[in-house]
Amino acid sequence: SSIVKNIIKKREIKPIETTLELAEIIKESVPEKYRRDKHPARKTFQAIRIEVNHELDVFETSIKDALDLIKVGGRVCVITFHSLEDRMCKQIFKEVSEVDKLLRKLPIIPEDKMPKFKVIANISPSLEELEFNNRARSARLRVIERVR
């Protein structure tokens, strides 16, 4: 990408020593039409933070651990703040709450093959919430319950 190429080019001249320097290099690398709303380095810094902190691995492990810990009737509620987290949460919830594709074709599904969980909710912020808290715009609340 042009961001990576520019970072490499600038580092050949001198080391990048501050986040402000890096932000400026990223800004220079992004076409003008993508610079209008928010600082163009925002998503790059988010991606770096996610990778350095292994956030998606920790997120996935945490959800799976929580699902293992709850008893019948217990619920796991997850608030996500960006699409990578939300997609991962949605996929995990789907995997544990649906009958296997092959088993769906059977006339009777054995009891031990029925899902242990049921998805209860997928909630986005209301218009009212967004009026006084615009930062909630990307938040999603997903809820799943152990049924067996």
Task: Show where each model-derived region lies.
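S-adenosyl-L-methionine-dependent methyltransferase catalytic core, i.e., the SAM/SAH-binding region
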Residues: 1-148
